[in-house]
Amino acid sequence: MADKKGSNSEKLLYCSFCGKSQHEVKKLIAGPSVFICDECIDLCNEIIRDEAAAAGVEASLSKSDLPSPQEIRDILDQYVIGQERAKKILAVAVYNHYKRLKHLDKKDDVELSKSNILLIGPTGSGKTLLAQTLARLLNVPFVIADATTLTEAGYVGEDVENIIQKLLQNCNYEVEKAQRGIVYIDEIDKISRKSDNPSITRDVSGEGVQQALLKLVEGTMASVPPQGGRKHPNQDFIQVDTTNILFICGGAFDGLEKVITDRTEKTGIGFGATVKSKQERDAGEVLREVEPEDLIKFGLIPELIGRLPVVATLGKLDEAALMKILVEPKNALVKQYQKLFAMERVELEIRPDALQAVARKAIRRKTGARGLRSIIEQALLDVMYELPTLKGVSKVIIDDNVIEGDGKPLLIYEDTPKVAGSN
């Protein structure tokens, strides 16, 4: 090892890579007939880190590390309550997708096509949460896009390539990582065609967007502006291949049950036919019978439906499921609020009758699991406002009267119980 300092009688040594002399660098390390300086070593380490990050995507998705469908399902169970069939369908589809990516380099006569996913279910049934959990489990870049904000290129609004730009932003513009990420497109049903017949006028937020999405979903080279840039003609773009990006599209598809029912009732005619009345059939049961022709009649173009071969339907969450959602998942709402209260050194108890009241209120509002937080937040608002200034409170108890707005939380002091807001 040669130090920066050296006598004039010594032969001057140079880095074999950058050409700097030993006096221009801090350290010069000698090898067999070559030298390398500390600056070149730092540069090498940076290159290795960048390449390792890109290779890490492939390494994390190698066969040995890729969780099996059962393992994927087990992890989904920790965060998502109910929707058992949808979780099984998703687990198999995601496993097959990343297994396919692993075998892309192998030459084979059989080419495996991509299994993009369509999730159909009411608001608050867990569509977005399922997609988020999958991305976190697989450690891949993930982005949520709202289909209602998209328009055809050239019109006011976001064009579909903005989705890929957001995906790049989420992985610090590492193209290799982005090309193996997951894109969740929400409200896909809101860009359905306005009628069964192709329109003679431009439908820039409906069928036009579906056509633009089609190219992205099936695989294309998307041109994305550089980091922090906006699109303009004289600009170099980042090229992102969307062929191996997994697209998950979700929507409530209000009215699809009627389309399915109309079709099934037409076929269920005859002496031996057993036709249930509309009242007897559960909405989730009807949705499970969805066929491509139903989605076409609803307003999706056939080409886009063909690129979403895996269809998973989610049912409405009942009272029991909503109560479980409040307490069972790893990041359950009750656990979150208990942690917030624990930061004030106060124990929070939400009684079973209160949980039931929260679930019933969410069902009345038709908000599903999505509405649970606002109900609890509203019930706890006053006590969370007062708690930091109250002295000696050790526990807060919430019952059904608090949830319904007919009572106030019970505060347990170190000495005696007291109702919040009372003097």
UniProtKB/Swiss-Prot annotation:
Residues 3-56 form the ClpX-type ZB domain. PROSITE patterns: CLPX_ZB. One of its GO terms (cellular component) is HslUV protease complex. SMART domains: AAA (SM00382), ClpB_D2-small (SM01086), zf-C4_ClpX (SM00994). GO terms for molecular function: ATP binding; ATP hydrolysis activity; ATP-dependent protein folding chaperone; protein dimerization activity; unfolded protein binding; zinc ion binding. GO terms for biological process: cell division; proteolysis involved in protein catabolic process. Keywords: ATP-binding, Chaperone, Metal-binding, Nucleotide-binding, Zinc. ATP binds at P122, T123, G124, S125, G126, K127, T128, L129. Zn(2+) binds at C15, C18, C37, C40. NCBIfam families: clpX, PRK05342.1. ATP-dependent specificity component of the Clp protease. It directs the protease to specific substrates. Can perform chaperone functions in the absence of ClpP. This is ATP-dependent Clp protease ATP-binding subunit ClpX. It comes from Burkholderia pseudomallei (strain K96243).
